Amino acid sequence: SVTIDYDKCKGPECAECVNACPMEVFEIQGDKVVVAKEDDCTFCMVCVDVCPTDAITVKE
């Protein structure tokens, strides 16, 4: 599963995860980054590595 802690996430002003994810799991919807295609996640952890606020949790 891929979860975003919205208390930590800076949303579209950051969007590092959106840009970094090779599977395009994340997308911007309004003022939030959302997990749009969780089933496409390959657990590569790039999103976790690039997130400056540690807002993303990935569990197989």
From Swiss-Prot:
Which residues are listed for [4Fe-4S] cluster 1 binding in this entry? 9, 14, 17, 51
- Supply the name of the protein: Ferredoxin
Instruction: Tell me which UniProt keywords the record has, alphabetically.
Output: 4Fe-4S, Electron transport, Iron, Iron-sulfur, Metal-binding, Repeat, Transport
Q: Which SUPFAM superfamilies match?
A: 4Fe-4S ferredoxins
What PROSITE patterns does UniProt report for this protein, alphabetically? 4FE4S_FER_1, 4FE4S_FER_2
| Cofactors named for this entry | [4Fe-4S] cluster
Per the entry, the cofactor note is: Binds 2 [4Fe-4S] clusters.
Task: Tell me the ranges covered by the 4Fe-4S ferredoxin-type domain, including all copies.
Answer: 2-30, 31-60
Asked if Electron transport is a keyword of the record, the answer is yes
Binding residue positions for [4Fe-4S] cluster 2: 21, 41, 44, 47
